[in-house]
């Protein structure tokens, strides 16, 4: 078993005792850091940065040099899987990700390959191996993927969407086609995450960014069902240690009980969910991650500390809390404010673990 100098994050996910509440930030390697912008400029564009193992490793490590974070997260993108299926991913200035060949019908789904993670997605595994080597056992490395539903929204809409009318039209008019796509994505994501674990990821997270746009019934059928399939198929132990799995549905606060039944180890919470309420509902079954509003990092340091204290008090004493933002850090947040946040979590949480 690889010895970790700091395993707080893994211990908290398994609801084991820790000295202070562990903390990391979604999108902690990102555009709010000047050093990230410099490395991205060196790479040329975003996907070139993802596909260069040395540069992906560099940006993964950048926030850890600035802040005493308790975990590193692989620098990559959720759209690597659809890209590897041949949909032609590109980035439009001001528009975000687009696909040249969106999925429009069952025939399109049937033509999609299930990517080999060590072949078409080998660059991701190279990045995982490189990061693990360079971390030198300081903190654990988190691997991740998008959820089948969230990946499908991009693949069917042809890119980002606000109303999700194209995929909802498929969902209601041709549910068979959408289920076929989601099933293929669930198989692909299971292989992809297991390959990340074998390459060295010590925990994994499934990001269901767009699950919250569904009705409760549709969420169960079209999102949660497929995440459950993935959890069932994941390697849960590697290198002599349990590999914890976190599910995060943005806007999914009303479905925590159902999410906790999947067999995952932890649930990510966005900032619209009260953490005390979440702990009452599912804290005996899973750990909780979250959940400060990312926009709070625009506030003065004293206000950030006040919010950290409030969330810590909401969760209360005992184990099973990983502090995080409720979604990704915004690109124009002052880096010093992120530092205030991380330091406050460690300092203010100690009394909750006595």
From Swiss-Prot:
Please name the GO terms of the biological process aspect recorded for this protein, alphabetically: protoporphyrinogen IX biosynthetic process from glutamate
PROSITE patterns named among the record's database cross-references: UROD_1, UROD_2
The reply to whether Signal figures as a keyword in the UniProt entry is no
- Root EC class: lyase
The compartments listed are:
Cytoplasm
InterPro entries noted in UniProt: UROD/MetE-like_sf (IPR038071), Uroporphyrinogen_deCO2ase_HemE (IPR006361), Uroporphyrinogen_deCOase (IPR000257)
Q: Supply the Pfam families for this chain.
A: URO-D
GO terms for MF: uroporphyrinogen decarboxylase activity
What Gene3D superfamilies does this protein's entry cite? Answer: 3.20.20.210
One cellular component (GO) term of this entry: cytosol
Q: Which family does it belong to?
A: Belongs to the uroporphyrinogen decarboxylase family.
What does it do? Catalyzes the decarboxylation of four acetate groups of uroporphyrinogen-III to yield coproporphyrinogen-III.
Task: Describe its partners and assembly state.
Answer: Homodimer.
Q: Which NCBIfam families does this entry report, sorted A to Z?
A: hemE (TIGR01464)
Q: What is this protein's name?
A: Uroporphyrinogen decarboxylase
> Which gene specifies this protein's sequence?
hemE
């Amino acid at each position: 078993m690889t010895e970790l100098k700091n395993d707080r994050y893994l211990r908290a996910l398994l609801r084991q005792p820790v000295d202070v509440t562990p903390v990391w930030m979604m999108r902690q390697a990102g555009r709010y850091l000047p050093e990230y912008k410099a490395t991205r400029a060196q790479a040329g564009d975003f996907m070139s940065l993802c596909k260069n193992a040395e540069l992906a490793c560099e940006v993964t490590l950048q926030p850890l040099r600035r802040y005493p974070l308790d975990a590193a997260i692989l620098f990559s993108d959720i759209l690597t899987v659809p890209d590897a299926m041949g949909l032609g991913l590109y980035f439009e200035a001001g528009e975000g990700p687009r696909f040249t060949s969106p999925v429009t019908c069952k025939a399109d789904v049937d033509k999609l390959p299930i990517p080999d993670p060590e072949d078409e997605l080998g660059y991701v595994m190279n990045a995982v191996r490189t990061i693990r080597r360079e971390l030198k056992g300081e903190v654990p490395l988190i691997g991740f993927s998008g959820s089948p539903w969230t990946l499908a929204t991009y693949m069917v809409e042809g890119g980002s969407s606000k109303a999700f009318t194209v995929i909802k039209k498929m969902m209601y008019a041709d549910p068979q086609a959408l289920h076929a796509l989601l099933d293929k994505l669930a198989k692909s994501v299971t292989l992809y995450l297991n390959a990340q674990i074998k390459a060295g990821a010590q925990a994994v997270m499934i990001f269901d960014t767009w699950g919250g746009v569904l009705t409760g019934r549709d969420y169960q059928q079209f999102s949660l069902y497929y995440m459950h399939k993935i959890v069932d198929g994941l390697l849960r132990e590697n290198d002599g240690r349990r590999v914890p799995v976190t599910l995060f549905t943005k806007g999914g606060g009303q479905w925590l009980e159902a999410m906790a039944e999947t067999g995952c180890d932890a649930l990510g919470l966005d900032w619209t969910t009260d953490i005390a309420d979440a702990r009452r509902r599912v804290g005996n079954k899973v750990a909780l991650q979250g959940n400060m509003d990312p926009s709070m990092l625009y506030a003065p340091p004293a206000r950030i500390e006040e919010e950290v204290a409030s969330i810590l008090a909401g969760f209360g004493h005992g184990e099973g809390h990983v502090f995080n933002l409720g979604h990704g850090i915004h690109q124009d947040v002052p880096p010093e404010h992120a530092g205030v946040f991380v330091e406050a979590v460690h300092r203010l949480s100690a009394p909750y673990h006595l």
